[in-house]
């Protein structure tokens, strides 16, 4: 629920395919830089249309500490509300929405290509990661 995030800056990271090479690379890059996000008082929440057990296995496999939420049923409903659902394939697109404490989206980092990762330089710039 969106009210769960009121009062917190949050980075909502949508992913299409847990356990795929591009998504694996992105999740590991986020994991490896999580301290920079925390230093900016920003919570990280990942969302996929995969089922909860798949997301838990993925998080465990890569030692992920931030939550990975299942937008499984109704299928892709949260992704649709954010405007990042691909109807033809039935997946979340690679969009990251950064919100302020009032749940207002202040920045979007995205890749419109399913098989192309987001440019991590955008995260580095936003969060002063060297």
Residue ranges and their predicted role:
Residues 1-130:
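Chalcogenol-based redox active-site neighborhoods
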